[in-house]
UniProtKB/Swiss-Prot annotation:
GO terms for biological process: anaerobic cobalamin biosynthetic process; methylation. SUPFAM superfamilies: CbiD-like. It is an enzyme of class 2 (transferase). Belongs to the CbiD family. It catalyses: Co-precorrin-5B + S-adenosyl-L-methionine = Co-precorrin-6A + S-adenosyl-L-homocysteine. GO terms for molecular function: cobalt-precorrin-5B C1-methyltransferase activity. The keyword S-adenosyl-L-methionine applies. Pathway: Cofactor biosynthesis; adenosylcobalamin biosynthesis; cob(II)yrinate a,c-diamide from sirohydrochlorin (anaerobic route): step 6/10. This is Cobalt-precorrin-5B C(1)-methyltransferase.
Amino acid sequence: MDEADEGRSLRRGWTTGACATAALKAALEALVDRPFPDPVALTLPRGERPAFALATRETGPGWARAGVIKDAGDDPDVTHGALIEATARLLPKGSGLIFRAGSGVGTVTKPGLPLAVGEPAINPVPRAMMTEVATAAGLADLEISIAVAQGASIALRTWNPRLGILGGLSILGTTGVVVPYSCSAWIHSIRRGVDVARATGRAHVVGTTGATSERAALDHLGLDAEAVIDMGDFVGGLLKYLRDHPIPHLTIAGGFAKLSKLADGALDLHSKRAQVDIPALARRLAALGATQAVVSEAERANTALEVLTLAQAAGLPLATAIAFEAATVARAVLGEAPVRVSVLVVDRGGRVVGEGG
């Protein structure tokens, strides 16, 4: 089965923005003295029309609240199963629509995001969707508060704290649909990380492949955690965004195997989409002056770690060579962008074993 077929066989889900809008639509029905619709149908930006079952419903004088359980389908989304509630409260005529961050929804505290500092982290498309359902209900003057149960703790497992979104989650989505394993959320977070770094005047950021490389890079460079952009396997996504939105200095930090893939030209470092080229590593050892015995043993290796261990035992700077080659590939992607590139190769113990740029 190819990846396209595999993606089609997986169950899609709905974004936090779609869930919040569905909850709001139900609350608005109750606010105008109609029964809560259950399920509540919602038309998404691309025309899909899912129905959302209500998990909670409540009314009071001049207000109504409804809740929906977030269903991310087969995507490994940290918000899957979270209760998302919308509370609509009538305001005096002329007040307009006012969005509030309820419990578990974050507040923007740094520039560079598509929302102003101090605003609730309800992104532009979900806001537009909510505005549309309010208009359809004939309600122009409302306070709309979105809450996510346990959102503050869930947010600690996301990029929000580093992006300066504090107190909870973001209400996200551009299409309303979560495509399983599309990685769109990760790419979105990479881009927002670059935007925030630029807006706050950072001259040096570190793209890391994981927690080990992050710790090693920060210790080695003396930078704080807010310099980190957790690119995971998506080095290409980071580089392509930096090409158009440059930051003066980028350090790429990762494990030897992943960065050997980058040195070979791979821009998606996931094992399903790029494999370590063991023969290429053996050829590099030969170019560094390895004996034929070492080269032959490297050619028989099963993993990149085995080749690195051979190189270290022979006193050959293979990791440094990989760092320089990876930096060359990165610069080629960046083109004429004014970004200085350096690379740190980190072993599994968290030690920097190669550096180049």
